[in-house]
Amino acid sequence: MSKATLAIYGIKDRNQLHYPAYTHDHNLCLMQDGRVLQYLQLERYTRRKYDNRLDLFLEELIDKGLLQLPEEFDLVSVNAFVGNAFITSGGKLRFEANRLSHLSENLESAWGYYQYETWQGREIEAYNCSQELAHIASCLPFYGAFQENSLLVHLDGAASLSNFSAFLYKGGKIQLLEYGWEMKYLANFYNDNALSFAMIGAAPGEHTSVPGKLMGYACWGDYRADIEQWLAEHNYFKEYWHREEEIFASIAETFGLSIESFNSTIPFWQDVAATLQHIFSREVIDKFCQLQQQTGARYLYYAGGCALNIVTNTQLLETGLFEQVYIPPCCNDSGLSLGAASLCEWLKGNTIATHSPYLNTLGLIPPQQQFSSELITDIAKLLMAGKVLGVCNGFGEAGPRALGNRSLLALANDKKLAERVSIHIKKREWYRPIAPIMLAEIVQEVASTPIQPLAKYMLMDFHIKDDYRAALAGVVHVNGTARIQVIESKDDNPLMYALLSHLYKEYGVLALINTSFNVRGEPIIHRPVEALAAMPRMGLDGVVIEYKLYLPDGLEEDRDLVR
């Protein structure tokens, strides 16, 4: 048994704000012999969305026994462009490293100290990991070792020394190809652009929520070459903060339109969003084409926040550039510690095991995963009656997507029901799509898009055949696509497989709405007690907690359904 690896992403932000600024989504991962022992996105524990205060909570997690550190472990810290050092609030865990001057193909030696008891501590073996490598290596715990002749790419808003980096895995080694900031302007569309923020009504502190909103909004419009030219001439209006009147005046002069607000129902803004998305997809895919031609790579491993762009992912798959494309479920910063720990374990010579996405473990009791057929029948009856149910089973998902363990479920055939879930329960904007969960054999029937590994993690779109759009009305977006989570077998998620199979066999139901168990601005539910408290607060019709069904007080008609 090799020494364990503790990896952290906890670089301190530059500003003491009530929201994350330059760093966000702090997380930690403990691995040994290639297996994840414990993992936590900090927000799930603290209940503060995108929480970036790991320095304030790490000692608490250790002292409470939630993070079960062995006597001996190696420490890996993921750095950021804002810095390298990490120290806990009480000084018990310390990490220091030299500032990176160039992007490495390896971990960099650093200095670490761990005080395991009062007045007793020791130096520990420590390594500094770039965000670029940590992002890419976050593929390892979900897809296993990199395949020979693979392109490894990271793309996000800002990492350690770049926002875009590319490596080639060949001959058992990671070889750096390039890194830099040339594609930063594209990422800025989604996290640092005055026009984008204004169109979707986002305040500066809400930058972490902009990408998902803008991608959903873009599907309502159409690409226009004249809008692209206008955007380019004004540097995409990136710095036009609080200069709305100048933007409106430019529209009037260029297009002859009188627009005086950023009302999201105005078609011009929808076309602007669609044009930004078109530019992003075109330029990113062109870059992948260039790198594939340069290297002859057969496979692509892709991570970073930009890998959550579903439209681009789908178009990339459709090019057929690579034999296979791999993106992890936690491809944004929430997966950095998983990547760093996996990279360190791999460099130690350990084989990285293939894991399920259900890795958020701290503070939770190991799941039983045993349920009765009566539970499936009862859940199905409630869903067929138009009810909305929450699910909190086992460990939580790694990353921003709910994949059946921390989900809200409802029938997928009703737009009104979908609006209830998305707008009234989750408090989301009208233009954002809501996604389904579906058995693989049903996907092959209703969609014209081939199933890819990304579908297991809701990271691609499927084009829904016309004949099935009415039966899936609640989850088909305005552009005729659906971001399906595909369930291949009961091993993916036993309860969801059993439920979907029962619903199809008994009622002909093709899919369910599957969206994250939270409301806008809050983290996904983590602990059972939170799920139970959320039921009345969110107006849910019931919750399934550790494979038991709970109904709100006073709903006797629902109790009659499941007796």
PLM features: residue spans?
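Phosphate/ATP-binding catalytic cores across multiple sugar-kinase/actin-like superfamilies
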Residues: 274-300
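Active-site cores of enzymes that catalyze phosphoryl transfer or operate on phosphate-rich substrates
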Residues: 216-278
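Short beta-strand-loop/turn "lid" adjacent to the catalytic site in phosphate-handling enzymes
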Residues: 67-114, 129, 138
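Flexible beta->alpha loop and helix N-cap segments adjacent to enzyme active/binding sites
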Residues: 7, 14-49, 128, 133-134, ...
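Extreme N-terminal starter segment of soluble prokaryotic enzymes
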Residues: 1-7
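Glycine-rich phosphate-binding loops at beta-strand->alpha-helix junctions
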Residues: 299-316
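Short loop/turn segments at strand-loop or loop-helix junctions that form parts
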Residues: 8-11, 34, 39-43, 75-90
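Phosphate/pyrophosphate-binding loops at sites that engage ATP/ADP/AMP, CoA/4′-phosphopantetheine
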Residues: 57-74, 288-296
